[in-house]
């Protein structure tokens, strides 16, 4: 790998195949030539193991950048880089802007991860910035993942990137055996529990053998909504068009979009009935169920409510790594790059949670989440087992994840994208127009669409909308969406940037939505 020549490598390696070891070797070569390496990871708190491996290997050569550094800590890091006391920068997405001058290598680990896309304030994708900096500095860029983004893999197949593959785990360890459970069948057989019979058996087997297990449920809170059993009224957030979620801690209802919270009502606000019932299961409720059914199990929970406290999250991961817990239960953050040698089992409670979100990449996100989470099992010297619970057992993303078959998934997904005109075959711009008054909102949105139609030219550009956004109100602002697709949107982007549209108050513009 030539640190003086720009080239993009897509490193496709199955979970546990040794991608980090390759990063270490490439970094060693880079700093031996007195150049700087930038290593991007999705989230520092959740990828502490890769940071530790770099620090253990390179010591003081490493500086870590993340958003929670104090100004003084950040300045100290910059000074170390300026004096060339350190040559390795590790950090989450914002580290891609680190003030390094003589860059010889950029690595984007887990390049598929959606957390590389900043969704608020200045919107950018750290992977795209990394590619731009690599080209500007004339250095290689490595994009690594067990589940590469469909767009990156397509570019590799087209010859734009060089594809490197690690198809086997280190020491030829087998991939975990995956069982798919159809939850409709469980209900037909009288099992209404959150745990299928196969899931319960796997949990008990893991505990009996003194191994560890990771359980994924991509919904935090206790119950996902609260409803009156007499009139059917669902308790909604007064500021957002979403159901309030019951959180056991604090005994309150909470909105996950605006953080509004209120006490649990004793009667229905619509009909005054006292027959208020909690529906659905979040991580807090599943934790309670685990403690009730498996009394000897030592259980830790890792979700957004926990990771607000950085030290607590780090302590949980450290303690799980030293086997102080038997089960780690959490949202999708439990799927992120963890390498625990005693984890022999993984349980995925609701494989459909991501599959049903209204975005073109829902199947890709589902395959990524299932494959990455399954890949946490069997990374030591013991074989791994995985149980995936779903109501859609015939969906191709779920079937291909069972076989750890990325190429098979890609081949089916890329055909669907081509037929429907989605990336990588067309560029996309997603707009959300917001206003407190619905009539004013409709007028603004319609004017934007009319203006875009008038300036798109004689091209294949399609403009859909305005239509109701997936969540029609957030923080007292009504929302309408506009979707633009076309093989080349450069002229329309330039027009938007230089027109009144760009300065329209309340408008969110997302280029290349993930």
Regions inferred by a protein language model and the residue ranges of each:
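Inter-lobe coupling/hinge segments of SF2-like helicase ATPases
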Residues: 5-442, 454, 481-482, 490, ...
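Pre-Walker A adenine-sensing motif
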Residues: 1-3
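A carboxyl-terminal module marker
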Residues: 450, 454-456, 461-474
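Short, low-order "capping/linker" segments at domain edges
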Residues: 472-485, 514
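Short amphipathic alpha-helices in soluble, non-transmembrane regions
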Residues: 444-450, 492-501
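Short Gly/Pro-enriched loop/turn and capping motifs at secondary-structure junctions
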Residues: 470, 489-490
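Short, flexible, solvent-exposed loop/turn segments with mixed acidic/basic and small polar residues
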Residues: 418-423, 469-475
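Conserved short beta-strand edge segments in small beta-sheet-based binding/regulatory domains
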Residues: 458-464, 502-514
